[in-house]
């Protein structure tokens, strides 16, 4: 069997090393459990010592409140451990082995190959781990928390747990003991906790009742720091999608808090993306350190337990896999060659222009690697403000060319040409762009790509409309299946699996029209008609813009010799190679003067549609299009749509689309529409069904088991779905489906699939060798202590404090020092800054703040803005309102502008973003659709002029922000959470501290000083007014005559009176805007919207 579908076994050396590592990990866990002394006394001693230190530190607010004594007994006694019979739903031996090894291995990171049933294994493992534990002879339900789970993961885990619960209830005998028959304790409820679903009290009750909770990291951090749940109440934590966690993620913050207070609970992490653990320097050890993991379990496809289970089924299977190798058309082959050459030259030019940044890995051998673009971005983005504009364009061109390569094999000719034409239009001279063509358009092979893309649509005054070669092969396969069903009488449906929803919709239309008179050509004609209509609307908008503005005259780009040829100056009428020179000149003008569609726009498309089909067929097509739109509307009401095609020859089979439609498709479902389509529905036998679905919607083994297809057609290669088919065939040995595996031969599709298989195998090989040499990590309770960083801080503080050394050597002043406290808005826990503050020994107190994001002292308040948030806040003028609130309540309002660690420390990259159908594939110089760099700086300057006392801090990374906050807190008092919470709300206490009064007096003084900005007002006039009028508000209420009596100058009175009236109107408008806003603080783009009842109050 070809290596495209099945992967052979690995080397014997790797198999032996995997077995040795698994055995060693399990044995080390057993030895630790057997030899572990009773360290409860030691823990008490350490806690007593910590409490003494805390008493000496005079802690203002406990980070995690001390729980009653019964919490300390939450650790299960090893003497109470007893065997329990638990039924699992894992049919394959290697899956059961994964659960067994995960249970006996302490704090393990389990990395599996794609498509081996990870979610089923996780659900069964959760079912086992949530078994009630025996504490002091009494059963107690376990509390297991699931972190970093996607919404679809929660749905599938919940379904699997319900099935496991049903099996457990049906398997109980009547003779069981009274303890085991307690259904309430042995139930394992699964709940999903989000900010919008549960309030504080409901979450507190859930924590106490136990069970399995899938919770967002932001909510869990707040609950841990606020004392809603104590770490000792948590039996263990399970982290999904560990490969997606960033450095200093919230999950690592949670696990650090959990392990610092709970040393006996378990931590498990799962991933099925081994490639992410070999991309950087020692990423496996880094990830294990962040997640507090101690062991690694590797389960690749070539592991002997897995391969023996899956390959044995393949050898005995009667239904072999049929590989359908489809050849590319001549036009597609030429386009693929041209795109690869363009990529080659763009990569070479990027390396030539940036030799100090270029990597040897940037070559054509790795260009199809999924991490190729990520590798370029990781190097170029941090230096984005230093590289030239041509280099920026090359980076975007490489991304766009890869996108075109993918579109070549996944989309039809019309969509591909539309993408090419869109790129040409985007590189025409524009009002908002001062540069010329994108570099890839200046390559000689670009003309080859453009010409053949046009040729697939229009050639020699007629529409060619080249069909996708896979469509014809798919129709032939379905015909063969139809004939086979006449003899074997298989009852299962036919499943067609593809990559995305758009392909599903396109295949449904193609199969519907395959047996009609015009067939697939009619589908392409309708799509081309729609494309022409969109082009006409776009041109109208362009003309409106062009009529208002003019083009820049000097719009040129410095093109290197790689992308240009010098024009030869000669007097000869004929020049050798003139055709090539003309082609290059034509390409130069492709994006400026020549419209690639002008050649066939005069050709009447409506006549071509009617040609050979007649008016009746055209009306039928329009009726089908209307029916399709209605069907799409019904889709969101049901998970399946039924496409009626009475002319189909697939045994009168019906096409059924399973999966989610694109989000832009809206529904207008009503009773009349439903009643209209009720008569069109009829019963369809399973063997006549053709199900079209995406790989994403089939991303679990349960989907295939529910459908039970007799035939599976893989329209595109996908390594994960291939493994799912193998697992499904191993489960249903008697009813194995017949599989058709379609791919383009000698294409980037085939090469990408082979590269993905090789990349996964190489990643597992590196992980096996790295795990063999991985150093063991040991830690004590002192290492887990949160207060390990405070010693250096106290020494630094003691040097700054000017204490009297004659009074007990200055110890009294040192004794009064307390631990640093920072009050953080609960919505800021999506960022990594609160976790870094915690790691640096600062007490982080979550509160619902109306004013500011971080309160570091009673006088200093920070409003943190990432660059994207800053641009959005400047646009909607929200930042000005936030600064005004901080200025009202704090003496030192501060705007903190924070960049990410991997970003360029400049506003230039962010001012170059704009929407271009897909922001990741833009090939134009992007003048920001939000704000340009000059506009950002201008708005910031206006903000500073409006609020002179506003401080601005620029931080290149969250780590630098921590250092800045530590420096600002040196020698200053700690903030009060109760005061910080009520600022900006209606619950202002009458006995508010003197700080508010001082701020009010300072505000009055600053308002009076604005009078000096009025032309003609001298200092003498200013002091005369201050001597007679003490309050600025009282001055605003004076009439013109009263002000004139004070000044005795009518001209000056007019100016002052106008100034006061203007100030009063602005204040009234601002107060109106504040009343319209909600009492709680809203968030920016990356903040999570919360309700007030979902956030805890300040801990006391």
UniProtKB/Swiss-Prot annotation:
The gene is RAD1. The keyword DNA-binding applies. Belongs to the XPF family. NCBIfam families: rad1. Keywords: DNA damage, DNA repair, DNA-binding, Endonuclease, Hydrolase, Nuclease, Nucleus, Phosphoprotein. Residues 1-47, 1063-1100 are annotated as: Disordered. Transmembrane segments: none annotated. InterPro entries: ERCC4_domain, Restrct_endonuc-II-like, RuvA_2-like, XPF, XPF_nuclease. Involved in nucleotide excision repair of DNA damaged with UV light, bulky adducts, or cross-linking agents. Along with RAD10 forms an endonuclease that specifically degrades single-stranded DNA. Residues 1065-1076 have a biased composition (Acidic residues). This is DNA repair protein RAD1. GO terms for molecular function: damaged DNA binding; DNA endonuclease activity; single-stranded DNA binding. Present with 1400 molecules/cell in log phase SD medium. Residues 821-901 form the ERCC4 domain. Its main location: nucleus. One of its GO terms (biological process) is nucleotide-excision repair. GO terms for cellular component: endonuclease complex; nucleotide-excision repair factor 1 complex; nucleus. Residues 20-30 have a biased composition (Polar residues).
């Amino acid at each position: 069997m070809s290596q495209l579908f099945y992967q052979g076994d690995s080397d014997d050396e790797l198999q032996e090393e995997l077995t040795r590592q698994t055995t060693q990990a399990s044995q080390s866990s057993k030895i630790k459990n057997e030899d572990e002394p009773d360290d409860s006394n030691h823990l008490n001693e350490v806690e007593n010592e910590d409490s003494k230190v805390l008493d000496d530190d005079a802690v203002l607010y406990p980070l995690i409140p001390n729980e009653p004594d019964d919490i300390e007994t939450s650790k299960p006694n090893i003497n109470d451990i007893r065997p329990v019979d638990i039924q699992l739903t894992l049919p394959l031996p290697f899956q059961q082995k994964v659960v067994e090894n995960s249970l006996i291995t302490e704090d393990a990171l389990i990395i599996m190959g794609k498509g081996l049933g990870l979610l089923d294994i996780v659900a069964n493992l959760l079912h086992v781990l949530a078994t009630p534990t025996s504490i002091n002879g009494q059963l107690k339900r376990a509390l297991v928390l699931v972190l970093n789970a996607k919404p679809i993961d929660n749905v599938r885990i919940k379904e699997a747990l319900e099935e496991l619960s049903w099996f457990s209830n049906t398997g109980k005998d009547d003779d069981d003991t009274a303890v085991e028959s307690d259904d309430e304790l042995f139930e394992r409820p699964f709940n999903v906790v989000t900010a919008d679903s549960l309030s504080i009290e409901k979450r507190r009750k859930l924590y106490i009742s136990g069970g399995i909770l899938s919770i967002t990291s932001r909510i869990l951090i707040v609950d841990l720091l606020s004392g809603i749940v104590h770490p000792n109440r948590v039996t263990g934590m399970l982290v999904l999608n560990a490969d997606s966690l960033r450095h200093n993620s919230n999950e690592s913050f949670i696990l650090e808090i959990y392990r610092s207070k709970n040393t006996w609970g378990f931590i498990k992490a799962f991933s099925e993306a081994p490639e992410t653990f070999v991309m950087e320097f020692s990423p496996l050890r880094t990830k294990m350190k962040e997640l507090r993991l101690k062991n690694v379990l590797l389960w690749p496809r070539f592991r002997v337990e897995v391969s023996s289970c899956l390959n044995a089924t393949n050898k005995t299977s009667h239904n072999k896999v049929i590989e359908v190798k489809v050849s590319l058309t001549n036009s597609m082959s030429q386009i693929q060659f041209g795109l690869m050459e363009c990529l080659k030259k763009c990569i070479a030019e990027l390396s030539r222009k940036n030799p100090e940044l270029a990597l040897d890995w940037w070559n054509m051998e790795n260009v199809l690697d999924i991490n190729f673009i990520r590798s370029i971005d990781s190097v170029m983005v941090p230096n984005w403000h230093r590289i030239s504009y041509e280099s920026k364009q090359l980076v975007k061109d490489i991304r766009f060319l890869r996108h075109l390569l993918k579109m070549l094999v996944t989309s039809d000719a019309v969509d591909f040409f539309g993408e090419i034409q869109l790129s040409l239009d985007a590189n025409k001279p524009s009002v908002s762009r001062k540069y010329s063509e994108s570099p890839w358009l200046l390559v000689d092979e670009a003309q080859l790509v453009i010409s053949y893309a046009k040729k697939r649509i229009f050639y020699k005054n007629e529409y060619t409309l080249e069909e996708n070669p896979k469509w014809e092969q798919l129709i032939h396969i379905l015909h063969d299946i139809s004939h086979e069903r006449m003899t074997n009488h298989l009852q299962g449906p036919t499943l067609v699996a593809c990559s995305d929803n758009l392909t599903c919709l396109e295949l449904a239309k193609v199969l519907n029209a395959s047996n009609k008179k015009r067939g697939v050509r009619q589908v392409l004609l309708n799509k081309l008609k729609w494309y022409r209509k969109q082009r006409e609307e776009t041109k109208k908008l362009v003309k409106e813009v062009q009529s208002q503005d003019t083009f820049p005259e000097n719009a040129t780009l410095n093109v290197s010799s790689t992308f240009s040829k010098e024009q030869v100056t000669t007097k000869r009428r004929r020049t050798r190679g003139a055709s090539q020179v003309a082609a290059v000149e034509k390409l130069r003008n492709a994006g400026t003067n020549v419209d690639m569609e002008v050649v066939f726009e005069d050709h009447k498309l409506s006549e071509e549609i009617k040609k050979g089909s007649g008016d009746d067929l055209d009306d039928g097509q329009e009726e089908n299009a209307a029916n399709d739109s209605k069907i799409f509307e019904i889709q969101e009401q049901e998970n399946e749509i039924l496409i009626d095609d009475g002319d189909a020859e697939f045994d009168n089979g019906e096409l059924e689309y399973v999966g989610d439609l694109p989000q832009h498709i809206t529904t207008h479902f009503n009773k009349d529409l439903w009643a209209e389509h009720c008569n069109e529905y009829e019963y369809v036998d399973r063997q006549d069904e053709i199900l079209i679905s995406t790989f994403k919607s089939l991303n679990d083994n349960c989907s295939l088991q529910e459908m039970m297809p007799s035939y599976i057609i893989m329209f595109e290669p996908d390594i994960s779905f291939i493994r799912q088919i193998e697992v499904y065939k191993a489960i249903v040995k008697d009813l194995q489906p017949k599989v058709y595996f379609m791919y383009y031969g000698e294409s980037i599709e085939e090469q990408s699939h082979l590269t993905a298989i090789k990349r996964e195998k190489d990643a597992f090989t590196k992980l096996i060798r790295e795990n063999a040499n991985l150093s063991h990590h040991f830690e004590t309770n002192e290492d887990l202590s949160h207060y390990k960083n405070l010693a250096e801080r106290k020494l630094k503080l003691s040097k700054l404090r000017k204490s009297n050394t004659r009074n007990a050597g200055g110890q009294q002043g040192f004794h009064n020092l307390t631990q640093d406290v920072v009050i953080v808005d609960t919505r800021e826990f999506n960022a990594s800054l609160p976790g870094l503050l915690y790691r640096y020994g600062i007490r982080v107190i979550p509160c619902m703040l109306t004013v500011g994001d971080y309160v570091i002292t009673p006088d200093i308040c920070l409003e943190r803005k990432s660059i994207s948030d800053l641009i959005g806040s400047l646009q909607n003028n929200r930042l000005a309102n936030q600064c005004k609130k901080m200025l009202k309540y704090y003496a030192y309002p501060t705007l903190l502008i924070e960049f990410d660690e991997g970003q360029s420390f400049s506003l230039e990259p962010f001012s170059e973003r704009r929407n271009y159908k897909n922001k990741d594939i833009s090939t134009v110089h992007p003048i920001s659709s939000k704000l340009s760099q000059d506009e950002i700086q201008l708005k910031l300057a206006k903000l500073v002029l409006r609020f002179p006392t506003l401080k601005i801090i620029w931080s290149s990374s969250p780590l630098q922000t921590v250092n800045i906050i530590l420096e600002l807190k040196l020698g200053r008092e700690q903030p009060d959470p109760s005061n910080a919470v009520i600022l900006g709300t209606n619950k202002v206490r009458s006995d508010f501290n003197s700080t508010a009064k001082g701020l009010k007096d300072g505000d009055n003084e600053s308002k009076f000083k604005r009078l000096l900005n009025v032309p003609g007002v001298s200092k003498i006039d200013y002091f005369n007014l201050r001597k007679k009028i003490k309050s600025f508000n009282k001055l605003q209420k004076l009439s013109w005559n009263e002000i004139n009596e004070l000044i005795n100058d009518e001209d000056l009175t007019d100016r002052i009176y106008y100034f006061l009236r203007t100030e009063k109107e602005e204040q009234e408008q601002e107060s109106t805007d504040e009343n319209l806003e909600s009492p709680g603080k809203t968030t920016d783009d990356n903040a999570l919207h919360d309700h007030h009842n979902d956030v805890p109050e300040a801990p006391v």
